Amino acid sequence: MNSKRRPFYFLATVALIVAAPRAKAELIQVTWDSNGRYEHQLTVAPAKFAEVCDRLKPGAQVQWTFEGSAPMNFNIHYHEDKAVRFPAKEDGSTSSKGTLNVTSEQVYCWTWSNKGQADVRLKLELLKQP
């Protein structure tokens, strides 16, 4: 390795190590209650995201609703091979609701991204129908 590049690689490595904990997102596994309901409140930091996920089977329906203290980007997605599919996607929403109709067995994720400069308080509710 060229000795002139060593300081650059060292500084780049240190920067990645220092930044890694701050880049951590909040990933949450859904835990349904006996009535098929899931409720959660959290805070999404600036430039971070929160993701709530669960494996769902075909025929299931999930009614979802959320309210945030400021606009966020929102989506419901799943991965199919290398492709990402989005049954729902909204930008700049402070609240929304809808129903996810599950057509294939996948891990579905409800995701909120905070593109703002301040923390956003988020309250969400999911209700699963078998």
What are these model-derived regions, one by one?
Residues 2-10:
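Bacterial N-terminal signal peptides that target proteins for export
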Residues 12-13, 23:
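Cleavable N-terminal signal peptides
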Residues 24-130:
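Acidic, Ser/Thr/Pro
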Residues 19-20:
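N-terminal signal peptide c-region/cleavage motif recognized by signal peptidases
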